[in-house]
Amino acid sequence: MFFPNARPVNYPGHIPLSPLQRMFLVAGSAIMGLKAPWRGDMIAVLGDASGQPFFLRRLRDKMLANETGRRILKEQPRMTSKSLNLPHLRTLPPNTLGRIYVDWIDKEHVTPDSRAPTRYVDDPEEAYVMQRYRECHDFFHAVSQMPTNIEGELAIKWLEFINMGLPVGALSALFGPLRLNRVQASRFRRTYVPWAIRNGLKAELLVNVYWEKELENDVDEVRQHIRLQQAPALSPNTP
């Protein structure tokens, strides 16, 4: 059966899909995401549709094998402007993770409230894993000090793919560079792909980091603890 209402709804907002519907949704969202990489809604749909049944389950199992990962899955925290208490983060010392994070989102004009909810993942726990991955994304940027321009987003997608193995990261990492000009593509291959691969392989599984518990810690100590290096400088306006 190919109709969504023929399948059970497993959590609020869940949209169940048949295998055929999932296949078309992956193809359509991948095409739209590559044509318009700023369409966060399409990237979110692609992540939902392509992550199951294998990739999200494997990522969840890795979280279950880790003490902090198990705690995150049990408590299922959400990252919002309210839960992170952004006004408080702006009062923290300059080199704390929380201050680095809030300064980064202010500079890049983004908000933790903009992440689309998971809809197309059937298992509720796996749906939370996808949501957690999505909501942690800005912390990867902030700790790495990568802007939200095309090169910065692609570098983080490479990092996410190598570290967590989700297909949405692989598709963005492999095909996204086609949108770079010759100078950008050369710089990206020489500098940011090696950085992403090196750090993706050696870093802690990034969804196993309880970012909310690290906000008042020195960001350099956090980087050392999770084994994630700051990226080579890339200006938001780099041509």
From Swiss-Prot:
Q: What cofactors does the UniProt entry give for this protein?
A: Zn(2+)
Compartment(s) of residence: Mitochondrion inner membrane
Q: What is this protein called?
A: Ubiquinone biosynthesis protein coq4, mitochondrial
Q: What is its main location?
A: mitochondrion
List the GO terms this entry assigns under cellular component, sorted alphabetically: extrinsic component of mitochondrial inner membrane; mitochondrion
**What is the uppermost EC class here?**
lyase
Question: Record keywords: Metal-binding included?
Answer: yes
Question: Which gene does this sequence derive from?
Answer: coq4
The organism is Schizosaccharomyces japonicus (strain yFS275 / FY16936)
Pfam family membership, one: Coq4
- Quaternary structure annotation from Swiss-Prot or TrEMBL: Component of a multi-subunit COQ enzyme complex, composed of at least coq3, coq4, coq5, coq6, coq7 and coq9.
